[in-house]
Amino acid sequence: MAAGETQLYAKVSNKLKGRSTPSLLDPLLAMGFPTHTALKALAATGRKTAEAAADWLHGHCNDPSLDDPIPQEYALFLCPTGPLLEKLQEFWRESRRQCAKNRAHEVFPHVTLCDFFTCEDQKVECLYEALRRAGDRILGSFPTLVPLVLHSSISYLGFFINDSPADAIREFAMAFATEAAVLADCTIKPCTKQLHLTLAHKFYPHHQRTLEQLAKAIQPSHSCQWTAALYSRDMRFVHYQTLKALFQYKPQNADELMLSAGDYIFVDPTQQEEASEGWAIGISHRTGCRGFLPENYTERANEADTWVKHRTYTFNLAMDLNSRKDFEASCRGNGEPHTPSMSKSVSSIQALQATISRRGILVVRHGERVDQVFGKSWLQQCTTADGKYYRPDLNFPRSLPRRSNGIKDFENDPPLSSCGIFQARLAGEALLDSGVRVTAVFASPALRCVQTAKHILEELKLEKKLKIRVEPGIFEWMKWEASKATLTFLTLEELKEANFNVDLDYRPALPRCSLMPAESYDQYVERCAVSMGQIINTCPQDMGITLIVSHSSALDSCTRPLLGLPPRECGDFAQLVRKIPSLGMCFCEENREDGKWDLVNPPVKTLTHGANSVFNWRNWISSN
């Protein structure tokens, strides 16, 4: 061990010479890790165990930033426990289910006591001592009951803390800042704003009433033991999005990330120019390595999911010596990020009743197209010299519908692949299992959309009961079709002849001839709004779900008019819809009490799968 490292370690040990806890650094040094990286690993895992820090170091062995002197960022929060926490967690769950995710869902229920600040890795234990001393100083004057006053505005909902209890909490935050400055050389800015516990922030205005009703179920008088909790985060990724891997992924190329289920990945939305459609560039939280990853293997995680809880101080005058040990060992034994456990969700029967008791609109993207897999020349690959169709690969459909102008018209109106048909059937089967009641079906005139609707209805056992209403107004933005000479949809008669149960009597909001190649973005969102108005007026007024099968763009342009939201910016719109996978869904429910629609969880889970590349057995034989 270098002399400088020995001196640094001695300084840390001497500063806390009175502590009885054994050093966590010695085992790491004995394993051969340098002092600075060992201290970095201890700080990143909450200084819980040497084993956790060693695991972190092994995981980050190829981390290019391992030797960089980048400290963690820390913050102190006042967190509720007990019955009050259970009620707050129930609000977190229900508000997200009924009103979609808002900024408050990114973090657990808390009162912020100070801004985030940095602390050198070798001084983190001094920070723990500062927390203990500040807590002991205020323990006798900390309020036995913290009154919470509900406050609501058009973009904020939360509890305010007023009067003398707020003064006592501020005094504690100031004491912590003072102790940390002396012991750990940290500059901490205690919170100067009115103390508050946020319930919802930056939500859609039409959700305000629902959120207020949910908040009224939280009784501030619920029993609660307040705990001061010290958390840390990686300061480099504050403005990144956090993704969570749903499945294992083994890299196919050297520049791809290895993923294990549960891994977190940091993604900078502004630095994705190099990534192709369906991929992202990210940095693994587990390894620190950078690379490409398939987006459909991940889901959005909460900001605080990667935060690490270090130590807590519980305010309780009756605390004995055993319970005070909570301060010494209050975070997870494995050093993993802290995620508050949620109370059990409502029963499946209650969820089903809630689903079928409202009128709903389910917007679904079509399944996988043949040209998505085999490229623009797919038609040449499956056409004989005399213009007949044959199946060169199992992912080509068994047959194609007859068209009056021949097979060439499929070039601009491709069918579903075999996998696309399977996707549609899988979604239909899941809808059947969920118990929802589909009462009407609309589809874009594109063959892939009508096919998807047909296969979903077949799995729902409704293919003979419900007719597909073809609505040209929900076809995708014509700007994306500008390279195609003309749109060549199958006529209703051709669809009928091909055994599609289409409604020949339905009068669409817009005729096919209204789809013009020079369409602007404003014209596109306007025709979608007009079409949705017609669909809503045409749908049965009784309870049930109207199924709309269209394109990825429809998940945005067909739902925002329902929700009363203005059109998205054109650039944001294009970036958003390119990431929507096959059979992606958005679900809107009508709230008849206020005559508005809410965006809620779809009745079925998402569909995710990997690629299956082309294989030639001749090449395999010759390689031997």
Curated annotation (Swiss-Prot):
Alphabetized UniProt keyword annotations: Cytoplasm, Nucleus, SH3 domain
Domain SH3 residue range list: 238-303
Subcellular location field: Cytoplasm; Nucleus
GO CC, any one term: cytosol
The keyword Zinc is assigned to this record: no
Keyword Cytoplasm: yes
Biological processes annotated in GO: negative regulation of T cell receptor signaling pathway; regulation of cytokine production
Region of interest (Phosphatase-like), ranges: 358-624
Species whose genome carries this gene: Mus musculus (Mouse)
Protein name, entry field: Ubiquitin-associated and SH3 domain-containing protein A
Protein role: Interferes with CBL-mediated down-regulation and degradation of receptor-type tyrosine kinases. Promotes accumulation of activated target receptors, such as T-cell receptors, EGFR and PDGFRB, on the cell surface. May inhibit dynamin-dependent endocytic pathways by functionally sequestering dynamin via its SH3 domain. Exhibits negligible protein tyrosine phosphatase activity at neutral pH. May act as a dominant-negative regulator of UBASH3B-dependent dephosphorylation.
InterPro entries: His_Pase_superF_clade-1, His_PPase_superfam, Phosphatase_SH3-domain, SH3-like_dom_sf, SH3_domain, UBA, UBA-like_sf, UBASH3A_SH3
Chief site of localization: cytoplasm
Gene3D superfamilies given in the database record: DNA helicase RuvA subunit, C-terminal domain, Phosphoglycerate mutase-like, SH3 Domains
Assembly and binders: Homodimer or homooligomer. Interacts with CBL. Part of a complex containing CBL and activated EGFR. Interacts with ubiquitin and with mono-ubiquitinated proteins. Interacts with dynamin.
Additional observations: Has very nearly lost all enzyme activity. Has very low, but measurable tyrosine phosphatase activity at pH 5.0.
SMART domains: SH3
Residue span(s) of domain UBA: 19-60
